[in-house]
Amino acid sequence: MRYLVKSAFQSKFDIYLDMANYTKDIFNYTRYESREVRVGKIGIGGNNPIRIQSMTTTDTMDTMATVEQSIRMIEAGCELVRITAPSIKEARNLENIKAELLKRGYDTPLVADIHYTPKAAELAATLIEKVRVNPGNYADKKRFEEIEYTEETYLSELDRIRERFSPLVNICKEHGTAMRIGTNHGSLSDRILSRFGDTPLGMVESALEFVRICEDLDYHQIILSMKASNPKIMIEAYRLLVVKMQEEGMNYPLHLGVTEAGEGEDGRIKSAVGIGTLLEDGLGDTVRVSLTEEPEFEMPVAIKLVDRYKNRSGHKKIEAVEPNPIDPFEYNVFRSASVLNIGGTNVPRVISDYSHRDAIFQCSLINIGYVYKEELDKWNIKDNASDYIYLGKNKLDFDIPGTLGVIQDLAHWDENRSNSYPLLNLDEYRTFKRKHLPHFLKIMVDDLNEALYDLLRKDAQCVIVLSTDNAHAMPHMRAAFMRLINSKVNNPVLIFRNYDELKDEECVQLYASTDIGGLLNEGLGQGIWISDKCLNCHSRNSLSFGILQATRTRISKTEYISCPSCGRTLFDLQETTAKVRARTQHLKGLKIGIMGCIVNGPGEMADADYGYVGTGNGVITLYKEKEVVKRNIPSLHAVDELVELIKQYGDWVDPA
């Protein structure tokens, strides 16, 4: 099967791939076979474990503060410490930071983070173990201009890049320094954008241009990354990168990260949707979870994500499915038929599990977005209100909103209650006589067979609740969707995941975001049903809507694209993010970027509706999409000015 991978503007730069083997086996867990790259005392790629890294948030010129923070990170599990070096003076001070760490007994490799300043990179490469460069701004300036290149002028630009980049490569060769070539979706050069657009293909070509220069100079100590704040784009870019590397005989290690993931639950969900999906594919040799929190808080999250794969290869074997109807390089929604308000063109639905509760009262539904006003005898319904409630054997003795469906086990089904539907197991389904009424069928992936497909094709009122007990859950479920699609079974499918064995709330967040988000990102599934014994009903509902928000399949709240703080940051990111969120969190569907400096400014906010960017000490610049609209605003008044800007463009509504 041939896969079309598109550039944004000119079809002549589209490419066709005759293979989609971004992993050796999309059904059974196998790690991507990358070459080993040495970074100081540790190996990355090859047979090495997946490494954990993070980045300091201190001023690089404050040696002791940077050392103390680095130690906290290392003791939390950080195996590579990245430090910003925006100019030569910061690059020079890396030597002092390294010396102090060694004096205290810490030999963890250091990584210099470079933007715009080749001379800083060249100096850093002589002092520490690794440098990171962004091909979008190492040799090019970004003016957001679309430039028409002939083939001759485009090649001459590549010659200019080679001239600018080659000195760093030669220094790295001489000193045994490793390099990460890290593309960011939001900071592609105008040259790349003019040919490929802000596409995964553009991200891949941006990095490979630099890799080809390295290979021409016989330098191979390279690690690659394809970061984006949108997990869909990030996943597609990494998969495409692996295939393109295979075509060119490369197998460099991969560093995984979702850039500007944010804070709290949202940051963890978005990170797991992106990073976790690729780890399921066996991709990834190092990981950073980018949270707008203290950097030492990132390590436990990354470790929980990575540790899930230590023994994954022992899972029950999954049978391959042919043909594969899923395009791994482009998002396509697989539309099912519609039953009730599930499937068809409806947004994915959320089912809340109340089956473990001893009793259910009107006030119990507050946790899933329904607030009863007794004095008015009315229900207020929030944007993140569950669509269905599963009662199991329980009953309700009060009236509920008409928008909330009730699912009960067949033996306890209150068939006289409106909006009440039975949940059947496979044996019950085979003998169920009322298939003209909407009903739910809970099955395991291994229950699927031709006889069941035949029954389902004839049953226009059945919603499938699909579950698995395979340790390699997401690919097992993906294989089931492939079988259903190939067998022309068009019933809507709810993705059911049970995490009763987990005792850690954060693990439930991360695992569910990986398992369910990975499927939604491939256009699979018409709803979410999470069961566990760890989260309360409110947290589980919030997690479900958070996964839908992160996969952009159902928007129920404001989205914040906020970078993790670093030494370039010009204000307190955590405090500022909290202030912006407090004023704007009711603006459903808006995306607001909060960036600590101009490096992570307009580029990384490419996807945002509004931007709040530090451009000097105590000074903020506001953006509408990519355009600067207000400059040099004192930070004391900047949140008020942001609210006024949102009002000016007609996107403001008063809080309820």
Predicted regions and their residues:
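Catalytic alpha/beta core domains of metabolic enzymes, predominantly
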Residues: 149-161, 165, 169-170, 192-344, ...
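Short, acidic/polar
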Residues: 61-72, 116-121, 271-275, 373-379, ...
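Active-site beta->alpha loop and helix N-cap motifs at the rims of alpha/beta catalytic domains
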Residues: 78-209, 352-475
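A structural motif
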Residues: 75-80, 128, 219, 283-284, ...
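Conserved, mostly hydrophobic/aromatic
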Residues: 52, 113, 181, 224, ...
